[in-house]
From Swiss-Prot:
Protein name per UniProt: Putative glycerol-3-phosphate transporter 2
Superkingdom: Eukaryota
SUPFAM superfamilies: MFS general substrate transporter (SSF103473)
A cellular component term, taken from the record's GO annotations: membrane
Family indicated by similarity: Belongs to the major facilitator superfamily. Organophosphate:Pi antiporter (OPA) (TC 2.A.1.4) family.
Subcellular location: Membrane
Organism from which the protein derives: Arabidopsis thaliana
Keywords tagged on the record: Membrane, Sugar transport, Transmembrane, Transmembrane helix, Transport
Length: 504
């Protein structure tokens, strides 16, 4: 049996059963390359909608579980330290999620991505449901909720590295920012779906808020196992009417045929080591940038419904259900922000410029939302939407296009076996910030919400500053066409450079 440090694949890829079934009814016997791309795009898109939807019930039921409700809350969260305990639950989930991300990324480059992803989805569905089961089982042990969240975080961590790796196997760098900008809408749509499902079911008891997303996750996990093609060689896909063994171009150098490199050798390139992945140009600054970006975005993810329900808007307090529904406006802004950030970064050939610019604009957006959001519902909606655009936009850009770019960086010489590892490093580091933000908010909000927003604005500022070196390199490239400098310092080769045509 291969050891943990083994750099070879530990599995044999097979064509999914669902695709074999579809091919029996197709006249040509095979799906086209574009049909496979569409299938991968849709399946990975809805899969991560489900992942995000499964995270949302925690924020929706916070007000119900805490002592501020008429019913008196739910022990052990109904005491004066209830918000702090809820923050600790969030910390447990996100801490394990962050650590698990690094491990999942390491394994994702070595295991069958389809099976590994399915395990993550079904496991997530199971433990999301178990949190809600406490409602009917009348569980009140803090350690029960803690243990369930720890396991949920562990299985959730499997999703992202696997999904980005699969998507990267099917789409090259050309227009990747725009494509992944659209695809990254899954984050916001998942939050919206989770909010609407959890809020809609809350009236029947808070346990139902967890069961709805749990069933969705489990069902889609089965669909993914049956239909998701991990990479072109697995399904013998042909690209744009050409044979799969057409040569692949790395810069100006023609290397071995695609068939030889991916089929004859069993797709058997060595996986990039964890420390080696950190040394890929651009990985470290974007990883630490995402630390602060996710600190801001996940604070909103976990606390925005609670904040809305506990602060007067237009002279009145909103119900828990209404607050949960209203909070989806932040994610609607995130959909626009993700697409906009991807498009701008493609046009400028500058991922760092775009990400930092959005985070700098998030600072006044946060300030205005805190100061003027209470005046009326209309103003609150406008400012919440604006905040979502500038906060989720760079979050989506870094976790998708940037991660895929760096996972196929030219320094890897065409080896796409770093995709899951690089994605895990970047999103895993960001998830540490995501764990810290909500738990700090649980304590700081008990003192002052103003202090919470000052913390978020400071994090947004630091996030932008961390990309300063990359921004300088990208600006020089824009002004003087210094591609070599960007290649050495920035996140990815500029879009004007010939794309690495290796079906990554």
């Amino acid at each position: 049996m291969a050891s943990w440090t083994s750099s070879q694949f530990l599995y044999e890829e097979t064509k999914p059963w669902g695709i074999q079934f579809l091919e029996k009814f197709k006249r040509s016997g095979r799906l086209s390359f574009k049909q496979y791309q569409a299938l991968v795009f849709i399946l990975t898109f809805v899969a991560y909608i489900a992942f995000h939807a499964a995270r949302k019930p925690n924020s929706i039921v916070k007000g119900t579980l805490s002592a501020s409700t008429i019913e008196g809350g739910w022990a052990p969260f109904d005491g004066p330290d209830g918000t702090a305990l809820l923050g600790q639950i969030d910390l447990a989930f996100l801490s394990v999620y962050a650590v698990g991300m690094f491990v999942a990324g390491h394994l994702g480059d070595r295991l069958d991505l389809r099976t590994f992803l399915t395990i993550g989805m079904i496991g997530t569905g199971l433990f999301t449901a178990l949190f809600g089961v406490a409602f009917w089982a009348n569980f009140h042990s803090f350690y029960y909720f803690l243990a369930v969240q720890v396991m949920a975080g562990l299985f959730q961590s499997i999703g992202w590295p696997c999904i980005v790796a699969v998507l990267g196997n099917w789409f090259d760098k050309k227009r990747r920012g725009m494509i992944m900008g659209v695809w990254s809408a899954h984050t916001s749509l998942g939050n919206i779906a989770g909010s609407l499902i959890a809020s809609g079911l809350l009236r029947y008891g808070w346990g139902w808020s967890f069961l709805g997303p749990a069933f969705l996750m489990t069902f889609l996990g089965i669909v993914v196992y049956l239909f998701l093609p991990v990479n072109p060689p697995t399904v013998e896909a042909e690209r744009d009417g050409t044979e799969i063994d057409s040569t692949m171009r790395l810069g100006d150098t023609i290397t071995e045929s695609l068939l030889e490199s991916r089929m004859s050798t069993g797709f058997d390139r060595k996986a990039v080591g964890f420390m080696a992945a950190w040394k890929i140009p651009g990985v470290a600054p974007f990883a630490f940038c995402l630390f602060f970006t996710k600190l801001v975005s996940y604070t909103f993810l976990y606390w925005l419904p609670f904040y809305v329900s506990h602060n007067m808007i237009g002279g009145e307090y909103l119900s828990e259900e209404t607050s949960g529904n209203l909070s989806t406006i932040f994610d609607v802004g995130g959909v626009v922000g993700g697409v906009l950030a991807g498009y701008i970064s493609d046009q400028l050939n500058g991922r760092a410029i775009t990400a930092a610019g959005f985070m700098y604009l998030a600072i006044p957006a946060l300030f205005l939302y805190r100061v003027f959001g209470h005046i009326s519902l209309t103003i609150n909606v406008i400012l919440m939407f604006t905040s979502g655009v500038f906060i989720i936009g760079p979050f989506a850009l870094i976790t998708t296009a940037v991660s895929a770019d760096l996972g196929t960086h030219k320094s890897l010489k065409g080896n796409a076996r770093a995709l899951a590892t690089v994605s895990a490093i970047i999103d895993g580091t960001g998830s540490v910030g995501a764990a810290i933000g909500p738990v700090l908010t649980g304590y700081i909000s008990a003192i002052s919400w103003d202090a919470v927003f000052y913390m978020l604005m400071t994090a947004a500022l630091i996030s932008g500053l961390l990309l300063t070196k990359l921004i300088i390199a990208e600006v020089k490239a824009l002004l003087f066409g210094s591609e070599d400098e960007v290649a050495a310092s920035s996140s990815s080769p500029p879009a004007s450079r010939p794309p690495i045509d290796v079906l990554v």
